[in-house]
Structures are given as C-alpha cells and as structure tokens.
C-alpha cells in the first residue's frame, strides 16, 4: 500500500490494485503537484464540502467514472445537481466495504458547505473524519477538525497505523492541539501533518509539530512524496 500527499488535505491511496483520492483539491491548489487531466482514480472520498476539499470532485468523477463516497447530503447534491452517476452516501458511525478495503466515517468538529457562484452556501451534511482499513493497515484521516477527546475512542476502536492530521490553525487545530491529539489520544505509528502552508492564514512550520510529538514517527511529506508499506 502506498499513501501520497498532494498538498492541503489531498491524499492518494493505492491498495489492493485500486486508486483512491481523498479531498481532491487539485486545479486551484498552489501546493498540489497533480494534473487533473492525468489523475486516475477508482474512488473519491470526501471529508466535507468546503472548496479546498470538495475541489475538483465533479470533473474528476465524470472523467474517471469513479465512485464518490461522502456524506448522504454530498452524495445527493452531486447526483441531483451535478449529474454525478456513481455516488455512495454515508454518515458518521457508518462503515462500508469496497474492493480496496473499508471506509468508516467518524466525528470531526468543523463545518461543511459549498458556496455557489451566487454566494449562497449549500449545506452538505456533517464534516467527518475517515478510518480506512486497507491491506491490514488502519489509516485515520481526521478531516478538518478541532481537538476533541473522543479521538481516543476512535483510536481505541481502530488502532491507527497512519494518521493524517491538520496543523494549520485558524480553521482547524494548530500545532499545539494537533500534537496533543497525537500524543494523548490517537497515538499512531506514523503521523503526517496536513492542511498547512497552502494559504497565508495557515502557514506553519511542520518541524515544530514533529518536535512536539513524542509517540511513533512523524513523516513530513512534500507534495508528491509518500509513505509505503
């Protein structure tokens, strides 16, 4: 299995001969190294509806015929408003099996909407974190979130091999809360900081996060770099 980071919160997972992308913010992402014209995926998984996560989902889903997995509201919106054919709606606490592995959505403390060109936001369900089980490994993508103690319950139920955690502050946890979450609640084997440096408001030094974490290993990935098992 291979996990690649592509800026902001975009993660590319390759496992069981399938390709999965999380939060495909590609075209307007100054930190993304991917090209929307050449990306190949079988599944697209969404944590929530904000532009820097919802990103290129419509174009990518139509181009690749990938199945989009997200909240029930996002699935309905993509199907009815954008004509995306392959959608799989879920909600917090739900788990579903796919041919690459399983997806379970868990709690995240954030918000979730998509703003149309007319300036009106569309509610797209609850924000969520994702627990993947692929090839015997557990990956926890926290999504955009603040710190909450039930991260420890998530990790107790699903001991985490790799955790992708936001450190950008302002909209999500910053370095202090993110490192606390890793040290006290999640305790993964590998931590990967995400959701930072894409915009001025979330500029951070990931080395400070690495220095603050005292459990497992911290991998600071540049866009295009990966963790492989």
Swiss-Prot record:
It holds the Pfam family Lactamase_B_2. The keyword Hydrolase applies. The keyword Hydrolase applies. GO terms for molecular function: hydrolase activity. Disulfide bonds: none annotated. It comes from the Bacteria. Keywords: Hydrolase. HAMAP family: UPF0173. PANTHER family: UPF0173 METAL-DEPENDENT HYDROLASE MJ1163, UPF0173 METAL-DEPENDENT HYDROLASE MJ1163-RELATED. NCBIfam families: PRK00685.1. This is UPF0173 metal-dependent hydrolase SAR1785. The lineage of its organism: Bacteria, Bacillati, Bacillota, Bacilli, Bacillales.
């Amino acid at each position: 299995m291979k996990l690649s980071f592509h800026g902001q919160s975009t993660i590319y997972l390759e496992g069981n001969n399938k390709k999965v992308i999380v939060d495909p913010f590609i075209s307007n992402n100054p930190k993304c190294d991917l090209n929307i014209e050449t990306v190949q995926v079988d599944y697209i998984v969404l944590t929530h509806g904000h532009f820097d996560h919802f990103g290129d989902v419509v174009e990518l889903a139509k181009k690749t015929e990938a199945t989009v997995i997200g909240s029930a509201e996002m699935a309905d919106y993509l199907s009815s408003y954008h004509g995306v054919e392959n959608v799989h709606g879920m909600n917090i606490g739900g788990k579903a099996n796919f041919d690459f592995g399983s997806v379970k959505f868990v709690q995240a403390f954030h918000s979730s909407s998509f703003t149309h060109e007319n300036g009106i936001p569309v509610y797209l369900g609850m924000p969520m974190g994702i627990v993947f089980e692929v090839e015997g490994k557990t990956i926890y993508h926290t999504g955009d979130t603040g710190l909450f103690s039930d991260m420890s319950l998530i990790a107790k139920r699903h001991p985490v091999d790799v955790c992708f955690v936001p450190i950008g502050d302002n909209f999500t946890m910053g370095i202090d809360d993110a490192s606390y979450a890793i040290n006290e609640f999640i305790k993964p084997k590998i931590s990967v900081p995400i959701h930072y440096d894409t915009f001025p408001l979330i500029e951070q030094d990931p080395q400070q996060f690495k220095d603050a974490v005292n459990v497992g290993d911290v991998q600071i990935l540049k866009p295009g770099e990966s963790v492989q098992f």
